[in-house]
From Swiss-Prot:
This is Anaphase-promoting complex subunit 1. Belongs to the APC1 family. The APC/C is composed of at least 13 subunits: apc1, apc2, nuc2, apc4, apc5, cut9, apc8, apc10, apc11, hcn1, apc13, apc14 and apc15. It comes from the Eukaryota. Residues 196-210 have a biased composition (Basic and acidic residues). Component of the anaphase-promoting complex/cyclosome (APC/C), a cell cycle-regulated E3 ubiquitin-protein ligase complex that controls progression through mitosis and the G1 phase of the cell cycle. The APC/C is thought to confer substrate specificity and, in the presence of ubiquitin-conjugating E2 enzymes, it catalyzes the formation of protein-ubiquitin conjugates that are subsequently degraded by the 26S proteasome. Mutations to this protein prevent the exit from mitosis. PC repeats lie at residues 873-895, 959-982, 1006-1024, 1099-1124. The gene is cut4. Transmembrane segments: none annotated. InterPro entries: Apc1 (IPR024990), Apc1_3rd (IPR048971), ARM-like (IPR011989). Gene3D superfamilies: Leucine-rich Repeat Variant.
Length: 1458
């Protein structure tokens, strides 16, 4: 008798890891419950705090279908859902002590604990149901006369079967449970109408003890609870059968072939029982039979293929039993066993640990798949016999999984042989056939004959044909995967052996063509006559027929051979290919629909590469065409399938921003590093930033950015060429004068430097950022003289605000997309003593929104230090970070620094005027665009305040004006709830220069700015007239000249749409009385008579610069540069008299305004025309005040904003921010804040817009240079080369890439509203490299370039064995040039080698040829029109097809003659 052999566990530590229990379970360990999934601890639930005993823990599924863990304690229970994306938990009330809990099909059963003195005659229920954690407990209703008594306890539950044990009657009862909805069952309610006067009397017995009284009271309360609540019924129990059994200790069950087997063990009698129940869908289970076994231990072992009962007899023999399949004895004698998953662990009489697994854990997935398919084909009983033979082959004969499967298949056929195969001893058999060849099955047939002699395969008579056909379809499925060809060949050889025995000549011929090696068939005569079915079905031949007819022809599938339809799901590749071909040949389906179908079927690009090359050619042709004509509605899966990762990266970004890593930085050569040390003029102070690779690409044609770097460098030594000076620099006083001029110029640089380095850093969490310090050292060249300004000149007061600006530049250099900026990082970078550097740093972080991460209590620590610049930086930074949010905490912080917001009668604030100025400006930022009435009223009162004090100076009133404008920005007359404030009329009083109080004159700039910002872009002509300048000379004399500039700019910003970039518009803005003075080229001397003209022109240029900010408008640039040249010329005119000097000051101020306006228009473009003029302004050595130098460097910074990666927006907030930053009243000295708070000069950061489009190579992940075609809404077309700044997004219609190196990518912004926002957020175009060398353009030069081409068809053809002979047509064609495509086709045909051609290769080639033939006609012509590959001309395809068909015919004819 055959016995299964076990394996010895060599390492005891591995005994629990040999097999995973592929389910989840819970275990009670002390005061905790462990949830274990696949033998790995998943979660731990601890109940130490509850101080209650854990009575039960189980996994169940409630009526809602949700899976949950239920833990029952003394009086409460916990429910934890464990499904996908569901971590809900509930606490349930348990009004009794729980004896046991069991999982049910719709929740759980709870069995309460019964006390020993409980009245046994009561009908008080003791088993309850819980169907949902939010529901009440429900009761069980009984169908029939049989009911549960108080002595019945649930001992086992499996599916709908509930097993109860009655201790009193000593019997097992089997019940069928059915769930009913308690809410729908209105008639079924718990009725307890009888009074329980004898058992549950409401009167206490005075003779009861204390403990009796407590128990009595508890039961009374329980009874009352059930009676009062009227619990509903949710489950019906129907009695099936009862058996008198004594002392049952354990229960288990197995299910097979519709029969449920429940086992129980009576250890005292050493007996086990099997109760068999027939399960019928939608019907009540019924009892079949009961069996008795002699056993000292029983347990169920369940695998994917087999379910058995493990029986250990008193003699130590172990066997696997099942009423539905043969018994499987295990070799040896054993003391004990245990089951873990599908593995049986045994301990033999010598104490050796052994194991055996019923699951087929073969490394060969083909065997697993074949077993799964056969399981569908064979009935359960026959399959268990088949799998039993497989287990015998594995464990009795120690075969490999492949050999065991083949042996079990062959055993089904050898059972019916007339002449039994001679059986040799197993040991000799293993030796004799250990060197068996690849394609014969002597060893397997020998084993199969032994299996067929021990197992009863007689019922397989009707299943031999289905088995053979099933294996045939498995082999056809394998033909669609070129990777598994060796497995397919082995299966085909097996099929050839089987069909030889069955005498199926057509099938034998079909398989014989596939076997290149000599196959040794073992003769065997089968007694059963199995008629040869039609066929054989060939999936590849079917594809050829479909392509030839260009329609889907019938496919003889499994159903045609009488096999169950459910088997079809086991052949996914065949089904998928049939659906794809149907889609391809459907005239109503496009190639894009075919791609969508592939995604729906789960076909990936990697899976496509495993198809035979003929099918792969079709699919890749479709994918390549679809890649050029992708649908904008495609998801990531479709785009990845067609290899358009560029489009996928844009439409479905995995990260919101592509941030350069430190690994992306350029690696410098030693020579470049040493040159920066030996030659100070080559130092590039900004070259360290990670975006340098992009900026270098943007300005790759010259060194303009390097020049800006040098001009805005304030931390390196400055070299001065002495020959450029007309004065003698040999004297110390003159040297000091020059040094002091250069010192002031250096101090004015940081704001511009901050613009240049904006957003260039992404610091690490542990990285400490330090500001670059000022370097005032001068080197006079030629020579070696080094000079520095006197220490008395460089005071703390002199450098305080420049140091503040250095800190702001450092904070702004940190990208707003950095994720590592938090409270800890800010505190890590805080110096021990607060400095102006750190104050500016806080402001810079706030401008980029990073102060939202700063904890509130840290803000209080900063503010209580009473450090003025720190308070200013923090207040403005918080207001900027919380821009427009009206955050309550930040409002409180700002309010306590503004006297106007304190309650009446409050003490005077001990706060500097500059801090209060920052506070009032911060209110405007915090309440931006909110139309907040209270804040609007306060700021307006501050503008018009008449009291004179150091606080209420022009700078404070201007800040109040900006704040009022920000609160109501661009709202115009649409100010809800503020009509009674009469903003326009009251502000107009503040604007008037004829005011009674001189303090109102100080408030005029603030009033002008407030009115301008409130009515910005509204085109309100009435308000514009009120702010406009008068047209007569007499009235103009009443106005301050600098206010004229503000009025002109303000009026134009209100009349936004009227501003035009042409000279006619400029001329129209000038009053008639000044037209005669309009031509600045005629000015030869400086005269105060022209002050009004200069201010009017500067105001016009300022408004023009803001109107076209960031657009790069060439006409606006031309106008502004023209005026800039004129003003620069005026700056060089001599100013000797007082009148001339006064005029010169105005000319310099107007020059800076025009320069800033020019830079605004060309922001980020680093335009050379503007740069040349700014370089001249920077290089002036004559005494120029600090403000003029600051304006020049701000113009330089805005011109090269972010190294060319950023530009300016034209939103309302952006224009307002630029108006505040470039306010045309610049400080005279570094300490000057009287007219305008210097910190506010940094609000330009709120106007920054990232518009630099950065293409990057998908393969290398590096930026690359790509031509772009940008179509604007006006119809203008721009040819650009990215990386480059794009025009404003709202003016772009479409962006598309050009060139031959990458797939063309077109982004249509007009027809896809989401694309504009995607482009704004990503700024990156990921491009797929692609060789666009087209055979259509150069068909004659294609062959010499085959090694470089990326065409998938040629990649397949040139690697095919058909073309790898010594006279390969590709080699021949590459050596000759011809102007005739037909001659190339002849060369290809003449050099064809058809040796060793298998059926799959031939059919694959036929598919390829048939596909290209069909592409010229019918449905495929419409889909592939003008896109057929021209290197395979139609003549070539016809000739090659003829040769292939001739070869097929000759091959078949030769076989027939043989």
């Amino acid at each position: 008798m055959l016995e299964l052999k076990t394996n010895v566990i060599q390492d005891p530590e591995l005994k629990d890891s040999l097999d995973l229990q592929e389910n989840d379970r819970v275990e009670i360990i002390g005061d905790a419950v462990h949830y274990i999934v696949n033998d790995h601890l998943n979660r731990v639930f601890n109940y130490t705090v509850d101080q209650q005993k854990i009575h039960a823990a189980l996994i169940t599924t409630f009526a809602s279908g949700k899976k949950a863990i239920v833990v029952i304690l003394d009086d409460i229970g916990y429910v934890y859902y464990v499904g996908d994306n569901n971590n809900d938990s509930y606490i349930i009330n348990v009004p009794f002590s729980t004896e046991s809990a069991w999982s049910s099909p719709s929740g759980l059963y709870l069995q309460r604990h019964r006390s020993s003195d409980e009245n046994l005659n009561t009908d008080l229920p003791h088993i309850f149901c819980l169907n949902d954690p939010l529901d009440e407990l429900t009761l069980i209703k009984f169908d029939g006369k049989k009911i549960l008594s108080l002595f019945d306890s649930i001992v086992y539950v499996v599916g709908e079967i509930v097993v109860t044990h009655n201790k009193k009657e000593k019997k097992l009862s089997f019940w069928r449970s059915r769930f009913i909805d308690p809410e729908s069952d209105q008639s079924i309610k718990s009725s307890r109408n009888r009074r329980r006067e004898s058992s549950f009397s409401r009167e206490k017995n005075p003779d009861l003890t204390r403990s009796d009284s407590i128990h009595y009271t508890a039961n009374t309360r329980l009874s009352e609870k059930f009676e009062e609540q009227g619990l509903a019924y949710s489950t019906i129990f129907s009695h099936i059968e009862s058996f008198p059994i004594t002392g049952s200790t354990s229960f288990d069950s197995i299910l097979g072939n519709g029969v449920l087997v429940i086992t129980t063990l009576v250890k005292e009698l050493e007996k086990g029982y099997m109760m068999l129940f027939r399960l019928v869908r939608d019907r009540s289970p019924y009892f079949l039979d009961s069996l008795q076994l002699h056993a000292i231990n029983l347990s169920a072992i369940k695998s994917k293929h087999l379910q058995k009962i493990v029986v250990l007899s008193s003699k130590g023999k172990v066997s696997l039993e099942s009423p539905m399949s043969p018994s499987l004895p295990i070799e040896g004698t054993f003391r004990s066993f245990r089951v873990h998953g599908a593995t049986l662990y045994l301990e033999d009489t010598d104490g050796v640990q052994r194991y055996i697994s019923l699951d087929n854990r073969a490394s060969n997935s083909l065997v697993k798949w074949c077993l799964s398919v056969i399981r569908y084909v064979l009935p359960l009983r026959e399959y268990e016999i088949f799998y039993t033979g497989h287990l015998y082959a594995l464990f009795a004969f120690k075969l490999s999984h492949d050999e065991a499967f083949i042996s079990s298949i062959l055993a089904c056929f050898t059972f019916f042989s007339r002449d039994k195969v001679h059986v040799e001893p197993i040991e000799d058999c293993n030796e004799a056939y250990s060197l068996s060849s690849k394609f014969h099955f002597k060893k397997e047939i020998l084993i199969a004959s032994q299996l067929s002699s021990h197992l009863d395969y007689s019922t397989f008579k009707n299943y031999l044909m289905p088995l053979a056909i099933t294996l045939h379809f498995i082999s056809e499925e394998l033909r669609l995967d070129s990777v598994v060809k060796p497995r397919k060949d082995q299966l085909v050889a097996l099929l050839l052996q089987i069909t030889t025995w069955l005498k199926w000549p057509r099938y034998c011929e079909y398989y014989n063509f596939d076997i290149a090696e000599t196959f040794l068939s073992i003769p065997l005569s089968i007694q059963v006559d199995v008629e040869e079915p039609v066929g054989p079905t060939s999936i590849l031949q079917w594809i050829i027929e479909c392509l030839r007819s260009q329609s889907t022809v019938p496919f003889y599938g499994l159903e045609s051979y009488g096999l169950p339809h459910s088997c079809s799901t086991m052949f996914p590749q065949t089904l998928s290919l049939m659906q794809l071909l149907d889609c391809l040949l459907n005239p109503n389906m496009t190639l894009q629909n075919l791609v969508e179908e592939m995604v729906r079927l789960g076909i990936s690009r990697k899976r496509c590469e495993r198809y035979p090359f003929g099918i792969l050619c079709i699919i890749f042709t479709v994918l390549e065409i679809a890649a050029e004509e992708y649908s904008p509605n495609w998801e990531s899966e479709e785009l990845r399938l067609v290899n358009r990762l560029d489009v996928d990266s844009f439409l479905h970004p995995k990260t919101p921003k592509w941030v350069f890593n430190k690994q992306d930085q350029e690696v410098k050569e030693i020579k470049a590093l040493t040159s920066t040390v030996t030659d100070s003029t080559l130092v590039d102070t900004q070259s360290f930033h990670p975006y340098k690779v992009v900026t270098d690409m943007i300005f790759r044609e010259d060194r303009r950015l390097a020049e800006v770097n040098k001009l805005l460098n304030y931390s390196s030594q400055i070299t001065i060429m002495t020959e450029h000076f007309d004065v003698d620099l040999s004297s110390v006083p003159m040297q000091q004068k020059v040094a002091q001029c250069i010192c002031v110029r250096t101090l004015s640089v940081p704001i511009g430097a901050g613009m240049l380095t904006y957003g260039s850093k992404n610091p690490l969490p542990t990285e400490k950022v330090t500001p670059r310090l000022f370097n005032f050292t001068l080197h006079l060249h030629p020579g070696t003289l080094i000079i520095q300004p006197n220490k008395e000149f460089v005071t703390q007061e002199l450098t305080e605000w420049p140091e503040f600006n250095v800190g702001v530049a450092l904070g702004l250099s940190i990208s707003k997309f950095s994720k590592e900026i938090n409270t800890s990082w800010i505190m890590f970078n805080r110096p021990e003593t607060l400095t102006a550097y750190h104050a500016g740093f806080l402001f810079g972080l706030g401008l980029n929104g990073h102060l939202k991460a700063l904890a509130t209590w840290h803000s209080f620590i900063y503010l209580t230090s009473k450090h003025d610049t720190t308070s200013i930086g923090l207040l403005l930074g918080l207001a900027s970070s919380y821009l427009g949010s009206m955050d309550a905490k930040v409002t409180k912080l700002l309010s306590v620094h503004i006297s106007a917001l304190l309650p009446v009668g409050s003490n005077e604030l001990n706060i500097s005027p500059l801090t209060q100025t920052a506070g009032i400006l911060g209110i405007g930022l915090l309440f931006h665009d909110s139309c907040h009435r209270r804040m609007s009223e306060v700021t307006m009162e501050e503008i018009l305040a008449s009291n004179e004090s150091e606080l209420k100076n022009e700078g404070y009133k201007l800040a109040a004006g900006f704040s009022l404008g920000l609160i109501n920005l661009g709202r115009g007359s649409n100010l809800p709830g503020m009509s009674d404030l009469k903003l326009v009329s009251r502000l107009q009083v503040g604007i008037s220069s004829q005011a009674t109080f001189q303090s109102l004159e100080a408030g005029s700039p603030g009033a002008i700015m407030a009115l301008t910002m409130i009515y910005m872009k509204t085109n309100d002509l009435e308000v514009a007239k009120k702010i406009d300048i008068p047209k007569s000379r007499y009235l103009l004399d009443f106005y301050r000249p600098d206010l004229i500039l503000l009025r002109v700019a303000g009026k134009n910003l209100i009349m936004w749409d009227e501003v035009k970039a042409d000279y006619e518009w400029v001329k129209y803005q000038i009053p008639d009385i000044m037209l005669s003075q309009f031509d600045l080229q005629e000015k030869k001397v400086l005269s105060s008579d022209d002050l009004l003209l200069y201010n009017v022109l500067a105001g016009i240029c300022f408004s023009l610069g803001l109107r076209f900010a960031g657009t790069g408008n060439p006409k606006a640039k031309e106008i502004l540069i023209n005026f800039l040249d004129s003003f620069i010329r005026l700056c060089h005119l001599p100013a000797k008299t007082h009148d001339e000097r006064v005029t010169a000051v105005t000319v310099i101020r107007c020059t800076q305004i025009v320069a800033l306006s020019s830079s605004c228009v060309m922001a980020g473009y680093c335009d050379l025309d503007v740069l040349r003029r700014l370089r001249v302004l920077h290089g002036r050595m004559e005494p120029v005040n600090y403000g003029a130098q600051m304006a020049t460097h701000m113009a330089l910074g805005i011109l090269s904003l972010g190294g060319g990666r950023y530009s300016l927006s034209r939103s309302n907030l952006a224009i307002a921010a630029l108006l505040i930053s470039f306010y045309p009243q610049f400080p005279r000295t570094t300490q000057d804040n009287r007219a305008h708070l210097q910190a506010a000069r940094n609000l330009w950061a709120l106007a920054v817009e990232e518009r630099c489009i950065i293409p990057r190579n998908q393969d290398t992940k590096q930026p690359c240079i790509v031509p772009l075609n940008v179509v604007q809404k006006s119809g203008a077309v721009q040819k650009l080369e990215a990386p480059i700044l794009l025009p404003p997004y709202d003016s772009i219609s479409s962006v598309s890439t050009l060139g031959d190196k990458y797939w063309n990518l077109k982004i249509d912004l007009d027809n896809n509203s989401d694309y504009r926002e995607l482009l704004r957020e990503s700024q990156t175009l990921t491009l797929m490299p692609y060789d666009r060398t087209s055979s259509k353009e150069e068909p004659l030069n294609l062959f010499p370039k085959l090694k470089d081409t990326s065409s998938p068809l040629w990649n397949l053809v040139k690697t095919s064995r058909l073309f790898q002979s010594s006279n390969s047509p590709l080699n021949v064609a590459s050596l000759q040039e011809s102007n005739n495509k037909t001659s190339l086709g002849v060369k290809l045909l003449l050099s064809m080698d058809f040796d060793n051609l298998t059926r799959d290769r031939l059919l694959s080639l036929q598919i390829l040829l048939q596909f290209f033939e069909s592409c010229w006609t019918g449905v495929l012509l419409n889909k592939f029109h003008s896109r057929q590959y021209l290197f395979l001309s139609r003549d070539l395809v016809e000739d090659l097809s003829l040769r292939v068909w001739e070869y097929v015919y000759s091959h078949n004819h030769n076989e027939e003659s043989v």
